[in-house]
């Protein structure tokens, strides 16, 4: 395989740009995709995002988390710089932890239509409690729907030891 042709990258506008515009309000329009060159194969793509920040919708206090986003692509894949800028757009966005991870998953489903996706947020403690929301999705009527159900019920059977993150 010779790599990607320029025409395959025409929708990737942020990567390599000399001018990066950071959105300070939630904006899913910043997300970009590129074609999956291996749609005949199941494989997992995982993003580890240790610097996610959002705001408490009630107090305006900052919330910090590590996000884990994993998916099995179909035809489209999310471009990583656009994902970084998208996650940055949550910086001044007020939402609960549970809503944030579900919003991220829903936006990525709409963008890529993956076979399977999961988003797990591991938020730092506030008031002595950490919240770790997990959500996932598998295409309806496929084996990925079954995988999603299994993963949901078994995703945290062996929780880590919390050492104040």
Swiss-Prot record:
GO terms for biological process: queuosine biosynthetic process; tRNA modification. One of its GO terms (molecular function) is preQ1 synthase activity. NCBIfam families: QueF-II (TIGR03139). Gene3D superfamilies: 3.30.1130.10. Substrate binds at residues 78-80, 97-98. The gene is queF. This is NADPH-dependent 7-cyano-7-deazaguanine reductase. Its EC number is 1.7.1.13. Catalyzes the NADPH-dependent reduction of 7-cyano-7-deazaguanine (preQ0) to 7-aminomethyl-7-deazaguanine (preQ1). Pathway: tRNA modification; tRNA-queuosine biosynthesis. GO terms for cellular component: cytoplasm. It is an enzyme of class 1 (oxidoreductase). It comes from the Bacteria. The lineage of its organism: Bacteria, Bacillati, Bacillota, Bacilli, Bacillales. Belongs to the GTP cyclohydrolase I family. QueF type 1 subfamily. It is found in: Cytoplasm. The active site is at residues 56, 63. Keywords: Cytoplasm, NADP, Oxidoreductase, Queuosine biosynthesis. Pfam families: QueF (PF14489). It catalyses: 7-aminomethyl-7-carbaguanine + 2 NADP(+) = 7-cyano-7-deazaguanine + 2 NADPH + 3 H(+).
């Amino acid at each position: 395989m010779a790599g990607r042709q320029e025409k395959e990258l025409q929708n990737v506008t942020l990567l390599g740009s000399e001018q990066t515009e950071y959105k300070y309000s939630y904006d899913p329009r910043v997300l970009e995709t590129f074609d999956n060159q291996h749609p005949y194969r199941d494989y997992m793509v995982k993003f580890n995002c240790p610097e996610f920040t959002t705001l408490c919708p009630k107090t305006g206090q900052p919330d910090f988390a590590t996000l884990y986003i994993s998916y099995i692509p179909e035809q489209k894949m999310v471009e990583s710089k656009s994902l970084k800028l998208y996650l940055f757009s949550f910086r001044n966005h007020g939402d609960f932890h549970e809503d944030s991870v579900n919003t991220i998953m829903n936006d990525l489903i709409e963008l890529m239509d993956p076979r399977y996706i999961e988003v797990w947020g591991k938020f730092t403690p506030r008031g002595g409690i950490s919240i770790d929301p997990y959500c996932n999705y598998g295409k309806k009527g496929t084996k990925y729907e079954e995988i999603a159900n299994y993963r949901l019920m078994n995703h945290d059977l062996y929780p880590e030891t919390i050492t104040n993150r």
